[in-house]
């Protein structure tokens, strides 16, 4: 369901939000000292290039397909922070001709879950560019993505004077227990994960930032049935024409200035939107959940989510008789989970 637009912030609230934005920008600026350049190819960035910014840890399984996927869509350069990976992530990325790589051993949680580092890269290199801010387990689809690349999409958004594209994060899962089998590096994750929950999803517009809050779907159904308000936030603004004066507040779920949050109103909205296919539940999910639980670097209160990690370790079956097999963007548009907005 789509969210109604909340009333904008009053004068005092607007002033406080400006101060908050400046504090976030200052945090991002300071965080540059935590990043060590490993491979800098940013000199090749040309006007009009589409950039992708991400923070990763131990993503050697997903990265080969991820990089090829976004290259095909038209991404010119990837700006990546490697947060102390222990697998082949760093050498894999350093060998790519279109990747600029930084490394850090600093705390992911203390850096606002990597957002300070990503925000610095956006500030330094993204100004004036259409930029994607993504995790390695997110594949963006949008109307006509099988025939029109990101250049075509962003050109159309520019003509509409729309600075961002919103998206629903849609969890994909297997029909059997999670964590079973194996996935080869470079394999299409949709060969393993091809089911999803078509709903229900609910959307709420929050004051004073006018940010959207979408929840629902399979993780709420399976892991948070008694505490639905603790379930994951599913709305994002993953594609945006960046301005160095802007600041993401909570991942790319919300942003300042507040009016940018109105670019997306959730499932059922009429404005152009996409879907982030979330490939979290590949066979490595149980091992990753155990590591995340031990490292305590996710969630503001990691201890309160111990039950969530324990449930993943039990390798549950997420599939239900209401699950749908994923068929493509037209299917999701027909279900109201994305909109072409007249494109």
Mark where each language-model region is.
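Short, acidic, metal-binding catalytic loop of nucleotide-sugar glycosyltransferases
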Residues: 68-76
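Active-site-proximal specificity loops/subdomain of glycosyltransferases
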Residues: 88-133, 141-147
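Catalytic-site signature of metal-activated, phosphate-bearing donor transferases
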Residues: 2-29, 114, 144-343
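Short beta-strand/loop segment that forms part of the nucleotide-sugar
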Residues: 76-84
């Amino acid at each position: 369901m789509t969210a109604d637009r909340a009333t904008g912030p009053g004068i005092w609230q607007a002033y406080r939000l400006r101060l908050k934005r400046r504090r976030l920008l200052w945090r991002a600026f300071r965080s540059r000292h935590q990043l060590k350049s490993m491979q800098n190819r940013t000199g090749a960035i040309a006007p009009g290039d589409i950039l992708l910014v991400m923070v990763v840890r131990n993503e050697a399984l997903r990265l080969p397909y991820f990089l090829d996927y976004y290259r095909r869509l038209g991404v010119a350069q990837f700006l990546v922070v490697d947060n102390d990976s222990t697998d082949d992530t760093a050498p894999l990325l350093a060998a790519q001709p279109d990747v600029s790589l930084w490394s850090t051993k600093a705390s992911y949680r203390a850096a606002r879950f990597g957002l300070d580092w990503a925000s610095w890269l956006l500030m330094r290199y993204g100004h004036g560019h259409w930029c994607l801010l993504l995790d390695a387990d997110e594949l963006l689809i949008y109307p006509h993505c099988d025939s029109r690349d990101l250049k075509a999409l962003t050109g159309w958004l520019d003509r509409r004077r729309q600075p961002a594209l919103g998206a629903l994060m849609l969890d994909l899962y297997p029909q059997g227990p999670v964590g079973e089998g194996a996935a080869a590096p470079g394999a299409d994750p949709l060969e393993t994960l091809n089911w999803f929950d078509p709903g229900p999803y609910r959307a709420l517009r929050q004051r004073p930032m006018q940010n959207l809050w979408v929840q629902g779907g399979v993780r709420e159904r399976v892991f948070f049935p008694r505490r639905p308000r603790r379930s994951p936030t599913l709305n994002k603004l993953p594609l945006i024409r960046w301005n160095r004066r802007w600041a993401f507040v909570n991942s790319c779920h919300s942003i300042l200035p507040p009016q940018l949050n109105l670019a997306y109103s959730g499932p059922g909205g009429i404005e152009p939107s996409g879907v982030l296919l979330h490939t979290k539940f590949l066979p490595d999910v149980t091992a990753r959940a155990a590591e995340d639980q031990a490292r305590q670097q996710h969630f503001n209160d990691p201890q309160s989510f111990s039950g969530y990690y324990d449930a993943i370790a039990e390798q549950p079956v997420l599939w239900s008789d209401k699950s749908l097999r994923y068929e493509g963007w037209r299917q999701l548009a027909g279900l109201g989970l994305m909109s072409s907005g007249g494109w």
